[in-house]
Each structure stands twice: as structure tokens, then as C-alpha cells.
């Protein structure tokens, strides 16, 4: 799947530059995790395995990077549940994933060790993390009967 590059695509929603760290450890993710409105000011600093967090009006605290990563995956898995998967019945397997609410469609191509998608989220996961799975990939995994990308990879490596 060929991806076009747009130099403005790595801008976060607030106009700041997205980086390897802010892609997963973002203030937006923190607000979702804590159930805070988007208007609440937060400050974050990255350390080895935790994120120092200060929410206006509260004492500073630490949030585990593992919690951010879990939120990153679970959010995409949840969003995948409302998507519709169409199997092209080709080799290698191709799928069209449609969002019924918006009508948007994305192409997902299955490989033994990954699912490639033409969406922006997958593109940035590849660039910043080196691997990944977007909500469209998780929709295909659910369609194929897998709970996680790791289960899918293991099944393919074991020849199931």
C-alpha cells in the first residue's frame, strides 16, 4: 500500500509537532484516561518508564507508560467494533474497512507478521513506533477471530 507524504500530517490537533513521545503519551490521551474535559490544563514530562503529570488544581503525580500504551491499544480496539469489514477474497488477503457513520473507507492488507493500512494513524505508528495496528487493523483482527495483533502473528508463525 503506497502512502503519500504530506509535510503537515505530523502536526498534532493543537498545531504542535507530533513526536515519537507525544504520539502515545499525549495530553489528549491523559485527559481521556482521567475523564477530564479538553479545557483542563495539564503538564507532562517524560521519564524512563513513567510520565510526570500535573493537572491544574491537583498535586503532581506519575502515570505509568504502560497505562498510556494500554489506553492507546484499547481505544483503537473499541473504535474498531463499529467498523464494517469487507473481505476481497484475494491472495494476499485484502480488506476494505468502512466506518458506517462517516462512510470513510480504508484498505487493509494482511501479511504474516502485520496488517498494513492506508490510514494516517497507521502511517504515524510505523514512523514513530516502527510497527502498529490502527482501528481498521483491529477491525480486521476481530473479523478474523483474533483478540490481538500478537495472537494473529503467533498463529501465522505457527502455521495455523
Positions of the model-derived regions?
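Long, low-complexity, compositionally biased intrinsically disordered regions
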Residues: 2-160
